[in-house]
């Protein structure tokens, strides 16, 4: 094929991609997000994330609470769950009994014990990177970059958890102060989800102004809808599995991790769709991998 013919093919390819982008922007946002979720097999991805959350993040949160409480016999990591979900008696007693007291975890606070859970965080971050790459229609990074970027993302996520917990669970506040603290805790979450595509997506740093808008998806879903839903449905899950004792608490946690996993996949899809609709067409076309949906 001559150079002129190749140039014509490139031009036709670009025109087709611009046409597909224009057509995609005409679809209702909710329908576009649903289509993207199905396109990347979001249900399966969410289930995988839920298992990794249950086996990695929850143990690290428990060990971290125990460490900062001085492994006290009168402290229970279940307190975090109780305060986060606003549980009341008799559910509070069940949760405390299921988690035990902090002194029981003293032997877990070793380099090998903590490092084991941290290492498991790397596969989780690589999974999240794959989800975002698919949702944003980008080619994934090579293995070395995926490991480095995934580790950075995972450490940033743990930092955000600590900061948010410090803000919202730092004291027994009520009324306007509690509302202000809740709003303040949304800021690091917004920053985190705005930076996630930059870390995990190829060419993810393009259109930074529009990434800030995409980051709002994380604020709405991860920091608002999921916590509110947790306070409504988690107590019902615990009550429904009352006869199973500690296993019932574990099953409720696993179920909730499943919803969080789905929420994260939806966050990736919503952020991608928002970015594609608000960023300049040239930026979107230059950044995306040439993938024909379906």
Language-model features, listed with the residues they occupy:
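Membrane-embedded alpha-helices and immediately adjacent juxtamembrane helical segments
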Residues: 1-294
